[in-house]
Amino acid sequence: MIPILHTEKLCKSFSNGAAQQHVIKNLDLEIMEGDFTVIMGASGSGKSTLLYALSGMDKPTLGKVFFGDTEIQDYTNDQLAVFRRKNCGFVFQSIYLLENQNVLDNVLTGAFAVQKNSPELIKRVKELLAKVGLDEAMQKKYPNQLSGGEAQRVGIVRAVINEPKILFADEPTGSLNSTSGRDVLDIFTGVHENGQSIVMVTHDIKTALRGTRVIYLRDGKVVGEHRMAKYGEDDLKERREKLTGFLDEMGW
C-alpha cells in the first residue's frame, strides 16, 4: 500500500501560561492508502490532536505533514480550507446539522458540486441516505426529530458525498447507545470496503475492531502497532482476543 499521508518529526505544543505543553513529540507516521487506521491511547495521549494535525484542521508547531508528495503544514488558512474541501471528510462525536434544513438539504448543503440541486446530485444523495437506513420519509425530517444515531448517519453521508480521499473520524460512536453505535460502525465498515481510507480516534474496543491497523499513543508518541485483516475476514473472537492482548501490553 502507498502512504496517503505521512509525517516527519511532527510536534504540536500548546501554551499553558508561561509553560509549553508538548502534546505530539517528533512523530513519524505513515497512513496507508485504503487502510482503516485506528488511533488509541489513554486520555491526554494526543489522539485528537494528532487527528487534527493530520487532517489540516490544526497546524503543527514543528515538523512536516505530507499528503502524497505535497507538504501541507505551511499552507495558509485559505489553502488549508481548499485542501480539506478537496481531499478530506470529517465525522465527529457531536454532529452539527443545520436546524432549519431537513436531512436531504443538510447533505446537499455540504456538497461541493457546481449545481447543488441538479437531479443527478439529488438522486445520488437520496441513494446514499437510503443505503444507511434513512428512507425518503426520514430524509424529510429535521435535526430535532432525529435520534443521535440517525443524526450521525446524516453526518457520515455528508462527509462522504464529495468522495474524499480520506475520511477522519473523532469518537464517532462516543455519544451513541450500543445499537446505534453498531449501526454507525457498520456504515464505516461499508465505506472502507468500497476502498475509502479512514483514520479514526476511539477509546472503544468494539470500534477499534473495525479497523485494519491500530496504533497506540502514549505521551505524544506511537509506542505500539497492531495489524488486523479487514473486518469480517477472520474469526471475531480471535480478532478481539488478539486486539485485547495488544492493548494489555500497551497498558491500556
Per-segment meaning from a language model:
Residues 55:
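Helix-to-loop junction immediately C-terminal to a conserved catalytic motif
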Residues 63-71:
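Conserved ABC transporter NBD signature motif
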Residues 70-71, 119-137:
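Conserved ABC ATPase "signature" region
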Residues 142-146, 150-152:
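Conserved ABC ATPase signature
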Residues 163:
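Conserved catalytic motifs of ABC-family nucleotide-binding domains
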Residues 167-170:
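Catalytic Walker B motif of ABC-type/P-loop ATPase nucleotide-binding domains
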Residues 221-246:
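Conserved beta-strand-loop-alpha-helix hinge in the C-terminal portion
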